[in-house]
Curated annotation (Swiss-Prot):
<dbReference type="Pfam" id="PF17136">
    <property type="entry name" value="ribosomal_L24"/>
</dbReference>
<dbReference type="Pfam" id="PF00467">
    <property type="entry name" value="KOW"/>
</dbReference>
<dbReference type="GO" id="GO:0005840">
    <property type="term" value="C:ribosome"/>
</dbReference>
<keyword id="KW-0689">Ribosomal protein</keyword>
<dbReference type="InterPro" id="IPR005824">
    <property type="entry name" value="KOW"/>
</dbReference>
<dbReference type="InterPro" id="IPR041988">
    <property type="entry name" value="Ribosomal_uL24_KOW"/>
</dbReference>
<dbReference type="GO" id="GO:1990904">
    <property type="term" value="C:ribonucleoprotein complex"/>
</dbReference>
<comment type="subunit">
    <text>Part of the 50S ribosomal subunit.</text>
</comment>
<keyword id="KW-0687">Ribonucleoprotein</keyword>
<dbReference type="GO" id="GO:0003735">
    <property type="term" value="F:structural constituent of ribosome"/>
</dbReference>
<dbReference type="InterPro" id="IPR014722">
    <property type="entry name" value="Rib_uL2_dom2"/>
</dbReference>
<protein>
    <recommendedName>
        <fullName>Large ribosomal subunit protein uL24</fullName>
    </recommendedName>
</protein>
<dbReference type="InterPro" id="IPR005825">
    <property type="entry name" value="Ribosomal_uL24_CS"/>
</dbReference>
<dbReference type="InterPro" id="IPR003256">
    <property type="entry name" value="Ribosomal_uL24"/>
</dbReference>
<keyword id="KW-0694">RNA-binding</keyword>
<dbReference type="GO" id="GO:0019843">
    <property type="term" value="F:rRNA binding"/>
</dbReference>
<keyword id="KW-0699">rRNA-binding</keyword>
């Protein structure tokens, strides 16, 4: 299966408490089919103090399942499906709604 969502992509959240928000993918977990998006799905983690770090409540982004995010169309900024096409002998990702190339 080809990677339809990659690190650095602008994505739109389709479901959950952050539905409608947009953000940039900071991490992709392909074995778990999950992605981490900056500023989305922020959770509080209670951490124990160690010799080097102070303990307390830390806010961090939790992962979201890939079915709940869609790549934002480079032209309109709306959610779109991703297709593939060869351009100059290279395989590139293309937004299905506008035909715009996603890979730059």
């Amino acid at each position: 299966m080809a990677a339809k969502i990659k690190k650095g992509d602008k994505v739109v959240i389709l479901a959950g408490r952050d539905k409608g928000k947009t953000g940039e993918v900071t991490k992709v977990l392909p074995t778990e089919d999950r992605v981490v998006v900056a500023g989305v799905n922020v959770v509080k983690r209670h951490t124990r103090a160690t010799q080097t770090e102070q303990g307390g409540i830390i806010e961090k982004e939790a992962s979201i399942h890939v079915s709940n995010v869609a790549v934002a169309d480079p032209k309109t900024g709306e959610a779109t499906r991703v297709g593939f096409k060869t351009e100059d002998g290279k395989k590139v990702r293309v937004a299905k709604s506008s035909g715009e190339v996603i890979d730059v």
